[in-house]
């Protein structure tokens, strides 16, 4: 019975002492992997940043193209007061004096041609 206890104690001591060495090795290995992982994270972060910058540039180009061609879309429509001397009327609309008298007898309004 004593030999079993001594054997068990010896195996236990060996396992603990070897396990400690493995812990130190594991800790060092984990530090190395973490440092490598940080470099991978930096690489991935830079790659993502480049993609986002490209996407932003494309969106800004689309916005500028839209603003060049959007004058007709933002044109004030029919039945809106206008200035008779202002030539910037939308295509298909003319600035005319209303035919009916009322509260707007001195104003000019936009009508279809």
Swiss-Prot record:
Tissue specificity note: Expressed by the venom gland.
Identify the InterPro entries for this entry.
Toxin_22
Question: Where is the secretion signal located?
Answer: 1-21
Q: Where is this region: Disordered?
A: 61-83
Query: Record's superkingdom?
Result: Eukaryota
User: Where in the cell?
Assistant: Secreted
Q: What's the main place this protein lives?
A: secreted
A GO cellular component annotation here is: extracellular region
Keywords (alphabetical) are:
Disulfide bond, Ion channel impairing toxin, Knottin, Secreted, Signal, Toxin
What are the cysteine partners in each disulfide bond? 75-90, 82-95
Spell out the residue numbers of the propeptide. Answer: 22-74
Keyword Signal included in the entry's annotation:
yes
Q: Which GO terms describe its molecular function?
A: sodium channel inhibitor activity; toxin activity
Membrane spanning segments where?
A: none
The text of the family note is: Belongs to the neurotoxin 14 (magi-1) family. 01 (HNTX-16) subfamily.
Q: What does this protein do?
A: Probable ion channel inhibitor.
Q: What is known of its domains?
A: The presence of a 'disulfide through disulfide knot' structurally defines this protein as a knottin.
The name of this protein is U11-theraphotoxin-Hhn1w
Say which species the protein is native to.
Cyriopagopus hainanus
């Amino acid at each position: 019975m004593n030999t079993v206890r001594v054997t068990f104690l010896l195996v236990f001591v060996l396992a603990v002492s070897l396990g400690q060495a493995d812990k130190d090795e594991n800790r060092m290995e984990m530090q190395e992997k973490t440092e490598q992982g940080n470099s991978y994270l930096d690489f991935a972060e830079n790659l993502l940043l480049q993609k986002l910058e490209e996407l932003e540039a494309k969106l800004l180009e689309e916005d500028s193209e839209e603003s060049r061609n959007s004058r007709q879309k933002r044109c004030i429509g029919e039945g809106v007061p206008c200035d008779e001397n202002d030539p910037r009327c939308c295509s298909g609309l003319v600035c005319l004096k209303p035919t009916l008298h009322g509260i707007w007898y001195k104003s000019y309004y936009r009508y279809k041609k």
